[in-house]
UniProtKB/Swiss-Prot annotation:
A GO term for molecular function: sirohydrochlorin ferrochelatase activity
Role noted for this protein: Then it catalyzes the NAD-dependent ring dehydrogenation of precorrin-2 to yield sirohydrochlorin. Finally, it catalyzes the ferrochelation of sirohydrochlorin to yield siroheme.
Gene Ontology biological-process entries: cobalamin biosynthetic process; methylation; siroheme biosynthetic process
Residues the record lists as binding S-adenosyl-L-methionine: G305, G306, D307, V310, T335, A336, M387, G416
SUPFAM superfamilies, alphabetized: NAD(P)-binding Rossmann-fold domains, Siroheme synthase middle domains-like, Tetrapyrrole methylase
Organism field: Xylella fastidiosa (strain M12)
Binding site for NAD(+): K25, V26, P46, S47
Name of the protein this chain belongs to: Siroheme synthase
Active site: D252, K274
Residue ranges, annotated region (Precorrin-2 dehydrogenase /sirohydrochlorin ferrochelatase): 1-207
Substrates-to-products reaction catalysed: uroporphyrinogen III + 2 S-adenosyl-L-methionine = precorrin-2 + 2 S-adenosyl-L-homocysteine + H(+); precorrin-2 + NAD(+) = sirohydrochlorin + NADH + 2 H(+); siroheme + 2 H(+) = sirohydrochlorin + Fe(2+)
Superkingdom as given in the UniProt entry: Bacteria
Amino acid sequence: MTANALFPLFANLHDRAVLVVGGGKVAERKTEALLKVGALPIIGAPSLTTSLQRWAETGRITWRQGTFEDSWLQEDIWLVIAATDQPEVNHAAARAAHAQRLFVNVVDDIALSNVQVPAVVERGPLRIAISSGGGAPMVARYLRQQLESLIDDSWGRLTTLFAQRRDTIRARYPNIEARRRFFETQLAGPLQRLLRKQRHAEAEAVLEAALAETPLTESGSVTLVGAGAGDAGLLTLNALRALNEADIILYDRLVSDTVLQMARRDAEQIEVGKSATGHSVRQEDIHTLMLQHAHAGQRVVRLKGGDPFVFGRGGEELEFLRTHGIPYEVIPGITAALACAAYAGIPLTHRDHAQSLCLITAHCQSSLDTLDWAALAQERQTLTFYMGVAGLPTIQQRLCEAGRAETTPFALIENGARAQQRVLTGTLKTLAHTAQTYAVRPPALLILGEVTALAEHLHWFGTAPLSAPCPPARIL
């Protein structure tokens, strides 16, 4: 049977009595929601949960101890919620409520209910209700979860900002069409972005200027965004929002097409990647592009693989932007060491094996020459080498010379956290040989330390780790 269509309605229950029949966990959740909106819950049940008992003792709720009685509805009740696990009690409460023309919700029973309690997303005064009409509540709950991740707290602050100036806005724009256009302009402007960055004073200034018809010109800005490593699912919610607000996206070579497809369709995408073997864009040219587009009033996203502040030259770019007076923000990402290790089943720290972690860049010989190899050769630490494929023979030689045991296990992770991921394992003695045997190519991350041996039985993503046979001994 198809349920009747429901009329969506928000009720003001502040200082109004609501009868909740039942004293279990479901009744507790309903009561907690009622308390949040200032209602006066009356709980009718033989016994209560610990929380309901505490609320009754502190006077937050009224308890009618016992089984449901029709007389409970003689107390100027506005709404009845039946939330027991006894169908006969729920039926009795519903019949009595219907007889007095009261709204009643019987949990998980459409036929006995004349109102449904929706799934709700709350952001301050902003409330979004989702209902399936009671027929498929899991659909409503699933959609609520999706909205929870998309709508951050700044929307609640924006709602409050507008509500505080409601009378001023209505007086300034008495015509409803003019008022609608004003709101549309402000919602598409910088207000919400400023509130998300906790810049409340600037947001208020923008709104006041708009009401005074002296709009403040929104300056361009640059957001450094970490795209994470490999799997597009590692992108953070803030990173996704930035991509959907961008006018220009300056992206690195290692950023996947899947991530770029999540960006706003109208955004211009410009590759500015660097490569050890192919075409590279100079850092000075990247600075120029950021400056040029920001000066044009555009929202620029500087999209980097991994995290902007882990071997991503993010610090240099912020110093440049600060010098030139360009507003900026930083959205961190999951760096390659964390992503690759997780997808290979390698805990970077472990109580029994490693108490410290080193992140090391090895993209050129000069980087390797400046390292303190004696410190890196110490045991009970995990080493992660970024951009080190070409330097693997040097890494092996210098660590062995510094005293790191040749039997120290390693994992070489190629295309980490991607569908093409390969994990190669061995010992320090076989490092260069293994990379050569399997023709390892960038992007690849080297993890060295006792924890890497755990990949053999903790791996969960892609194929099992591979290892090369030991190289033949040299004949002297």
